[in-house]
């Protein structure tokens, strides 16, 4: 699974038991757990998507600034989403390192930039808006 931050996560079976390996940095671990592990457990135990713990809801946001993507990986940059009369807007403004737990407090969403794609100011992209 090629995502940033979050690499490389491990997902598989060992002796008929599921195994998950999470990255060491807190932001990476949180995103991998929310996007991969929680949905897997929910599907195994028959928990509906509405009842399942998840990262948030997928929305479309207009970028207020350029956002760099990641080569060959889905890129989840932390963003601050605001709701205005014209729609939803997203801004990045803090250090994006995967060890920067503070960024998870001051931001309320992440970009979903496809591999090898940067987000340009004024562009509308998909994002997750945290619950």
Question: Where would I find each of the regions flagged by the language model?
Answer:
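Flexible glycine/proline-rich
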Residues: 1-131
């Amino acid at each position: 699974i090629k995502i940033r931050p979050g690499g490389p996560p491990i997902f598989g079976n060992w002796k008929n038991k599921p195994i998950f390996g999470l990255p060491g940095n807190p932001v990476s671990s949180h995103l991998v757990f929310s996007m991969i592990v929680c949905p897997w457990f929910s599907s195994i135990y028959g928990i509906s998507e509405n009842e399942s713990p998840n990262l948030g809801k997928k929305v479309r946001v207009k970028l207020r600034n350029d956002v760099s993507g990641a080569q060959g990986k889905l890129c989840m940059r932390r963003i601050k989403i605001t709701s205005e009369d014209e729609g939803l807007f997203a801004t990045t403004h803090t250090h994006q390192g995967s060890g920067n737990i503070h960024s998870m407090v001051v931001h309320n969403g992440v970009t979903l930039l496809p591999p090898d794609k940067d987000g340009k100011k004024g562009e509308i992209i998909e994002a997750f808006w945290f619950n």
